[in-house]
């Protein structure tokens, strides 16, 4: 955990730093109290990153360029458009959020596409 944040900051676990990851960013944010900002409002215009959030525990309220998403434990929220302004607030103490981000084009899968012919995609309808 990163020590020394502001009193109203969530606990920050820099997974990318801990494991020395270089292909994508990964962090876990844990709310000390309810109504605590887990992800400050921002966009990724400068970096071009796509971001994926997974609620590990508790519940969070996401705001995505004006749209609101209520996410409970096990919910994933994907933000593929870097221009979308995003933020997340914990709805309960102990809410834990995994955040993963990477710039477009930095990942090439080694999986065989035929394994997924029967697996639906979020953007398929």
Predicted regions and their residues:
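Residue-level recognition of conserved beta-strand positions in structured domain cores
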Residues: 28, 56-57, 64-66, 90, ...
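Double-stranded beta-helix
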Residues: 89-125
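A short, N-terminal "cap"/entry segment at the start of jelly-roll beta-barrel domains
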Residues: 1-36, 41, 116, 120-125
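Short beta-strand His + acidic residue motifs that chelate non-heme Fe in jelly-roll/DSBH
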Residues: 62-63, 79, 85-92, 108
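Short, conserved secondary-structure segments in the cores of folded domains
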Residues: 51, 67-68, 87
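Short, surface-exposed beta-edge/turn micro-motifs
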Residues: 23, 49-52, 94-95
């Amino acid at each position: 955990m990163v020590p020394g944040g502001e009193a109203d900051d969530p606990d920050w676990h820099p997974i990318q730093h801990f494991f020395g990851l270089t292909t994508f960013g990964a962090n876990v944010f844990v709310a000390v109290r309810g109504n605590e900002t887990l992800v400050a409002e921002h966009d990724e215009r400068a970096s071009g990153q796509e971001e994926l959030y997974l609620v590990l525990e508790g519940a969070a309220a996401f705001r995505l360029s004006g749209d609101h998403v209520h996410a409970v434990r096990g919910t994933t929220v994907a933000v593929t458009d870097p221009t979308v302004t995003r933020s997340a607030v914990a709805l309960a103490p102990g809410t834990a959020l995994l955040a993963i981000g990477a710039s477009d084009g930095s990942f090439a899968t080694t999986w065989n596409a035929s394994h997924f012919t029967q697996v639906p995609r979020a953007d398929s309808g």
